[in-house]
Amino acid sequence: GSEMCIRDRHQAWCYDFVSEWIVGENRQDLVEILRNVEEELILRKRFKQVPLDDLVGTEVFPCVNECILTQIMTEISNHIINVDMIINTVEKRRTLAWYDDVECYYEGILQVAKMQAFFLEHSAGFHTVEARNIWKEYTEDYYRMDTYYRHYHLAFGKSLTVGNDHLDDLFKQVTDKVEGLYTHWFLGELGNNWSDACADELAQYGRILLVPQQVDFYNQKVKNEDNRVFVIISDAFRYEVAASLAEQLRRETQSKVSLGSCAGIFPTVTKFGMAALLPHKQLSINERSNGDLQILADGMSTDAGNRDKVLKATNSNSVALKYKDIAPMRRAERSALVKGMDVVYIYHDKVDEASHTSDSMVFPACDDAIEEIKNIVRIIRNEFSGTRVYITADHGFLYTYSPLSEDSKVDKTCLLYTSPSPRDRTRS
């Protein structure tokens, strides 16, 4: 080993020298040197023979990370997922050399470990009888699986731009296992349980009993507030992303943050959900001459350009704004828009907008949406002196990397001509 070539009195200096080089401006020069040494001494092949426990604390050579990841990914591909080992390995490697170069791969296997832990907790499957209890379980526990899956695909998507010849094919094999665990086990079994449990209540009442309804949002949350109310409506901002936002707001703002849910109106598309969040006594549907559907609140159009009017019909001191309009404004301009207002609706569109570009952009857009909504909250608190803020959505979304099978799809005509009724979609 190298310790035989270095005098004892120089070991500390040599260690500091290499450590500073690793994090210094010329680190890329060191990478080239180390890669040459790896090839010359066939270190990759040698390290593959070393037990994982002995490699975890080893740094300096970049190929150590690749050897560790290769072993773990190979085991995952062979259905061997040691949850504790993976979590401990990732946490240990975070602080060592060259982690940033392969961070997305480590983050990917970390999410696999979390998904496997969830699977082990619920290996008996989902067999809850009452729909309201499934709802409760999802909003308190099951949503975590959606978060793990989203974070996994954020990491996997990053790997497609970073690239590593030794890891990329293995990562794709791991992705196949993730799809099986999430799409076929989690969505499949939980979806079947939910469909069976809610069928009778939906048929008899058109909603899930004892679950808050989206159509009641304004009357229950906004109408009777004594103080000025701000409502941020983020298009397609689903429940599990809201849970991540809530956690960050608690940590960063030291505010009282609570997370709730409600059943969205059916079908869960923008025009229906946006209408449900506006004040109304009755929602109705008008079919235009071109076949498009228009949603009316007490006879008034709820299209984007008319929402300010709908709000003012209930409370004249109300205003509807768009984040993309107020974001570039000066503080004084923004403040003038909300001066004297009791109810302020701020519409935000990041996730849904991304879905119109590419499905693969939806998960990255969730992180962007979180940051933008935190900025809206900052504006409300610091510039508008707001203390009561609701963050909600018109609908959520369901995304899988692997395409849905034909029997998972619904004929569009079934949606267009079905009377609006509550749907099993949660939101903040």
Question: What is each residue range found by the language model?
Answer:
Residues V229-F230, V377-D407:
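Metal-dependent active-site segment of extracytoplasmic phospho-/sulfohydrolases and closely related
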Residues G1-S2, R7-R46:
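N-terminal, non-catalytic alpha-helical interaction modules of very large eukaryotic scaffold proteins
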Residues L245-E252, D359-P364, Y399-T413:
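Short secondary-structure boundary/capping segments
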Residues I208-A263:
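Segments forming glycine/polar-rich beta-alpha architectures that bind adenosine-containing cofactors
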Residues E179-L181, N193, A354-V389:
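A long, amphipathic alpha-helix that forms part
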Residues E32, I42-E189, N193, A263-S360:
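His/Asp/Glu-rich, glycine-adjacent segments
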Residues E3-D8, Y417-R427:
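Conserved small/polar residues in nucleotide/adenosyl-binding loops
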Residues L283-E287, D407-S419, R423:
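Acidic, Ser/Thr-rich peripheral helices and adjacent loops at domain boundaries
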